[in-house]
Amino acid sequence: MDWGYYAKPSKTFCQGMVNKQCSFPRGKVLGGSAVSNVMVYHRASPLDYDFWASSGNDGWSYKEVLPYFIKSERIQIDEYDHGYHGTNGPLRVNYTAPHSTVSEPFFRACEEKGLKRIDYNGKDTLGVSRVQFNINFNKRDNSAHAFLDPIIDIRSNLRVLLNAFAIKVLLKGSTAEGVEFVKDCKRYIVKARKEVILSSGSINSPQLLMVSGIGPREELNKHKIEVKNELPVGRHMKDHTMFFNLVFRSNEVAPNKTLRENLERYIKGETPLTNALGVENVAFINTKTPGKGLPDIELITSPPPLGVANKLQSILFFNFDSDVSKVFDGYNPLTDFSIYVVLLNPKSIGSVTLQSKNPIDFPVIDLNYFSDPNNEDIETMYQGVKYVLSLSKTRAFRDINATFIGHQLGCEDLKKNGSEREYWYCALRQFSTTIFHPMSTTRMGRSPKESVVDSKCLVHRTKNLRVVDAGVIPNIIRGHPNAPIYMIAEKISDEIKKYYGEL
């Protein structure tokens, strides 16, 4: 179900992980990473899309893409900004079941800091909100369930081939003619009468293009791959960085249920066991001009009893070193909750390159966090940490005795002898990891020198070949990419139908 990727070892982040490598989960399943993500439905800021359009990507302003967000959505919550949401689409959007006991105190604490309660997919982008999820009656909704399942048995022109692995796009000159793939240890070729569309995600689509001869000349030459189209494939990758070792202990205690009681609640679809991986509320803040402009930090709350990772989870899921993971032994799942800090607009640029010309070999993922020359990324995250710590001074947090207890293992000497900034910089490098949002590896744009696809997601200087996934996002958005990917797919579907005279 997961590709089992790990990012390239680093000296600037993931310092608490085995071999200083972040784990990098990607969905190896029908439906992709939407089957394994946290299901957050977030469109990001309208100005993100206006920037796409002003950068030369005609047709991608927020006004122009909003109908495609609305088209696929079926919102099932009671209070939302009307005019921004759809009610008849296949993709359900809902809240999880009842709030935890620390939910309302978090809202009130943020309000004391000047934030207002918002529909973050509506007219406001700065504020605090419950998380809108792709959930259908406490069950995950994703691209396979919402879009594919209803039509799979009734569409005569649709065939889904499972357990098949694409290894090359077949090119004749500059024209894509088909795809070569492997299934059950045998090679097959399928020819395309009209187009080949890659939707393998921000990691696998660039790998497939490069092994097919489309990519940076020096990278292809390095692996003795014939250069058929020189484009910056795999370059310009950006990802949201997350710091999650900010733990509070309060006097609000989650019910300590028996195994039988928990099983009964699970069968009935009741939280917290059917909650969205422990995520509940979000706040979007601007650390530089509070209350104004665009968000640069997202705060995510994770309440009891799923609010803190245990040692085993930290090792298996996040690849933490067994010594560093001891910090999680000191947390109590019944009383402790976490607030994650997410960097929304990073300046650091990563890449996807090849390990070899063999498409079976994993690609090389270089996240390159905290590498920007002015240290703006790590400083912004530090300001986000300070904001979270300041919540403990609010009346709302004092009322539940919410006390910060997070222990930044490996940075103790700096706490004693260094500055506060040095201490938290160390902690950020030690415990920060990915929130699994890689984008822009096959980004959209006008110039073949700076981008891979045009505004219709057609690969530059190539005929009959498109990429439609998070890789085409021109520049990282200030939010979770799942909803924008659905929007991109809806919009390009119309482009394709228009081109072939079917719309």
Each predicted region: which residue ranges?
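N-terminal redox-cofactor-binding region of secreted/periplasmic oxidoreductases
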Residues: 1-503
